[in-house]
Every structure is written in structure tokens, then in C-alpha cells.
Amino acid sequence: MTATRRLAAILAADIVGYSRLMGADEAGTVQALREHRVAADPLIAEHGGRIFKTTGDGLLIEFPSVVGAVECALVLQHLAAERNTAVPGERRMEWRIGVHLGDVLVEGDDILGDGVNIAARLEGIAEPGGVCISEDAFRQVRGKVEVGFVDLGDQNLKNIARPVRVYRVALRPRAGACPWQGTGGPHAGETPALRTIAALPLP
């Protein structure tokens, strides 16, 4: 089968501490994950996503739009937070999510290449319940989703040849926020990790 190339938005999601959860309650964890998927899969489809690979506790999803991918990430995290409300802290299922826009190789129903690998590495550095996106993805969503972003600067991701500039999604909408927090100019006195960018819809 000949592989073809295309540009795609890739979302990588993984359950935090899945091995620990399985060790504590295997049957309960499997059932809880199944319930998460039953609730999440229709939402993924609604945002144009196609799950092309599952890894037990993880998902790799292709989207035709970066906006769709990021909006889906926000919905998935909101859904997980709601489902965890009545769950003890040590039993909660939380996603880490990474989103990247990049060139990928398509072989049948599978998708391969650096575009997928970068999304997976971004997921790995996201906080529990958090979302990290690449600069390539950020350029496409700024001003189109109702959240802010924290500039984490260039990050060296495992097995990725070049540093990737990363943005953490500020999951709470920040209506009326200024484009850059801080005083004395857009970057004065700030480290990259403290630069928070508003990404509210343009009027």
C-alpha cells in the first residue's frame, strides 16, 4: 500500500496515571474508561474528528480543522471534569491532551509521521486536565476560540529533532483580557511561561 501525504490537525489524548488506576481497581477502571468513551466519542465526531488509533488508555484523532481539534479538546476536558465531580481524587480519570498541525503520512486508515509524534509529545508535557498545542496549531486558532494561551517557549520534545514552541491552553475563558498580561511592554519582565495571550473571537 502506497502512503500519501496530507496536512492534518492531530489530537493526542491519554489518561493520567492509568497504570496506577488499573492496579488499584482493574475492573472499575476499565468500566470507567468505557463510560468516558461512550460519552466522548459522539462529541469527537461532532467536531469532525476521526479516531485512527487507540492505545488502551489513549486516543489519536485526526481533524480537518485545528479549530475543531482545539474546541474538541476543550469539550473533552470539560466533560471529564464534570464526570469527576463526585469521584474521589485518587480515582479520577483526567486527560492530558496535545494538538499539532503538521504533515502526516496516510496508510489506509492509519496516520504516521512527525505530525503524529509531535502531538503525542505535546500530550506528554500537558498538565493533568490540560491541553498543550504547538505554534503551528496556535497560529490557526488565535482569535477563533474563546480561551487564552500561555506561551511556554521552545520545548525540546523527546525524539523530535528541533525544538517546538508550545502554548498551554488557559481553559477558563478570559473575556475582556488584554493581548498580553504584564506592564512595561508586551514582554517586559516576563519569562515565556508567563506570557498569556488572549485568543478571543475577533469582532
Where are these regions (language model features)?
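Catalytic NTP-binding/metal-coordinating core of nucleotidyl cyclase/transferase enzymes
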Residues: 1-72, 78-79
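Catalytic beta-strand-to-alpha-helix segment of the class III nucleotidyl cyclase homology domain
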Residues: 38, 60-171
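Juxtacatalytic C-terminal regulatory tail of Ser/Thr protein kinases
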Residues: 169-184
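Short hydrophobic "helix-edge" motifs at membrane interfaces and signal-peptide entry regions
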Residues: 3-5, 46-47, 125, 148-150, ...
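A generic fold-level signal
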Residues: 2-5, 10, 54, 90-94, ...
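Acidic, proline/glycine-rich low-complexity intrinsically disordered segments
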Residues: 181-203
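Protein kinase-like catalytic core scaffold
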Residues: 9-11, 16, 100, 165, ...
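Short, histidine-centered active-site or binding-site loop motifs used for metal coordination
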Residues: 25, 55, 101-103, 201-203
